[in-house]
């Protein structure tokens, strides 16, 4: 950055490289402060200085990180053609994200507002199609897989873990039942409050993002179950019920569903995604739909990879950052809600024929719950939830409770009665069992950074004295 003008490169290119350098520098320090708090701040050390450097206060490091992102926003353009490079909006968007993480509400609002004022980004018209698209006006910073290079990003480094066993997948990375239950009903109420929720037909009357994120399936209690079954006999199933097909097959995790519809032949074939035939089918009966594309069927040809765009920052997050920060400052207005969370909800309900549940101004605590639930629904499987749990100080609760899985079909359970989602009833139905997942509150990957001793090994004694968990630093 100091010597760019002496290289003979055009000023516009020098400015681009400066912007990208500031972007990476600011982003890296934001990540460090999010996970470690205080950290070494290097603004140009000599080697001797680096040997004795100590951690700088988190607020000092964060201020420098935001300064770098501001400089990046000054140098970077609004957009590029045909290239995946950081832009002005990405710099501002990440500044908003990390300001929110550190509860710097005003900075988060200001950075998000600048993103919104750029006029460059907008919500993708269709929520489900966005995650199958090769580009989107909503993507502010993303990675694109490449099947020629056999490279995927995010969990698409190994899609076999997410696809059905019928085509050779493992299907062992399931959406949690807690995520499933967190989606509201179409009246905007959670399932334990809404009269619309039917535990025996759990996808009915739910936020449309549920069936766009988790693969839906029919139960014999569904209102149109007779028509559903008839369509498989008369060959109209793919046309009438496309949402219940994944990768060429009907999905039905019920232990009583011995066969499923195969699109290519129009015939019923053995169901290998049910506990009736495979003990390792989806452990809780749920599989991912978000991101899944038909060409995932060929995952073995591409070293298990997929070429989806994996959004690391979406415009929807900027909108949700804005409204959350405004609410935390006690300044959230109806206009704020309408241009953020309500805009996102309207998109989710578009083309469904159902009016979206408009969020209206109410108490700060009530809005806080709504905003947090919507973040979970909107950004599932996009790498955001973990940091949200940390900054909301609820990870010790969410990670220290039961998880629910289906028993094998031959476990002497009498019925598979659907999903009730009741926190007070540990056995969600007779076929659900619980596995306790423990979480030590002190075991967050935040805080301790070991010094290095004369042998080049981490010196853990000061960390242990300070109360940090150091297990993950020790060699086995």
PLM-predicted stretches and their roles:
Residues 62, 105, 332-334:
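TPR-repeat structural position
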Residues 1-36, 50-52, 56-60, 69-83, ...:
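Conserved, well-structured interaction surfaces
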Residues 88-263, 399-416, 423-424, 429, ...:
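An aromatic- and glycine-enriched ligand-binding surface/loop that stacks and positions planar moieties
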Residues 208, 212-344:
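C-terminal substrate/ligand-recognition segments
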């Amino acid at each position: 950055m100091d010597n760019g003008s002496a290289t003979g490169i055009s000023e516009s290119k020098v400015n681009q490289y400066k912007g990208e350098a500031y972007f990476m520098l600011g982003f890296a320090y934001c990540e460090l402060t999010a996970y470690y708090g205080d950290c070494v701040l290097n603004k140009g050390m000599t080697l001797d200085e680096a040997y004795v450097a100590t951690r700088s206060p988190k607020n000092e490091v964060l201020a420098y990180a935001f300064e770098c992102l501001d400089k990046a926003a000054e140098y970077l353009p609004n957009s590029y053609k045909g290239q995946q490079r950081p832009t002005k909006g990405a710099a501002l968007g990440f500044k908003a994200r990390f300001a929110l993480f550190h509860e710097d509400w005003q900075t988060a609002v200001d950075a998000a507002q600048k993103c919104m004022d750029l006029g460059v980004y907008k919500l993708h018209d269709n929520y489900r199609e966005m995650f199958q698209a090769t580009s989107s006006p909503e993507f502010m910073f993303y990675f694109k897989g490449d099947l020629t290079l056999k490279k995927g990003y995010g969990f698409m480094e190994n899609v076999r873990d997410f696809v059905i066993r019928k085509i050779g997948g493992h299907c062992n990375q399931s959406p949690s039942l807690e995520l499933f239950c967190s989606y509201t009903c179409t009246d905007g109420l959670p399932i334990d409050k809404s009269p619309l929720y039917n535990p025996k037909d759990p996808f009915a009357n739910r936020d449309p993002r549920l069936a766009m994120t988790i693969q839906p399936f029919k139960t014999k209690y569904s209102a149109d179950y007779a028509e559903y079954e008839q369509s498989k006999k008369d060959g109209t199933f793919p046309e009438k019920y496309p949402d219940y097909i994944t990768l060429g097959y009907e999905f039905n995790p019920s232990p009583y569903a011995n066969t499923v519809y195969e699109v290519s032949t129009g015939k019923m074939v053995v169901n290998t995604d049910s506990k009736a035939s495979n003990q390792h089918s989806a452990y809780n009966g749920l599989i991912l739909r978000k991101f899944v594309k038909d060409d995932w069927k060929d995952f073995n040809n591409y070293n298990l990879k997929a070429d989806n765009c994996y959004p690391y920052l979406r415009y929807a997050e900027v909108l949700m950052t804005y409204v959350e920060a405004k609410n935390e400052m006690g300044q959230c207005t109806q206009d704020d809600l309408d241009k953020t969370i309500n805009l996102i909800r309207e998109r989710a309900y578009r083309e469904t024929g159902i009016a979206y549940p408009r969020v209206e101004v109410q108490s700060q605590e009530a809005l806080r719950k709504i905003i947090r639930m919507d973040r979970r629904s909107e950004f599932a499987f996009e790498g955001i939830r973990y940091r949200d749990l940390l900054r909301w100080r609820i990870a010790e609760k969410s990670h220290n409770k039961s998880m629910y899985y289906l028993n094998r079909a031959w476990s002497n359970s009498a019925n598979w009665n659907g999903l009730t989602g009741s926190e007070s009833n540990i056995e969600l139905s007779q076929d659900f069992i619980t596995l306790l997942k423990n979480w030590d509150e002190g075991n967050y990957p935040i805080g301790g950074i070991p010094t290095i001793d004369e042998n080049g090994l981490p010196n853990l004694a000061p960390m242990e004295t300070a109360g940090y968990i150091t297990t993950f630093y020790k060699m086995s």
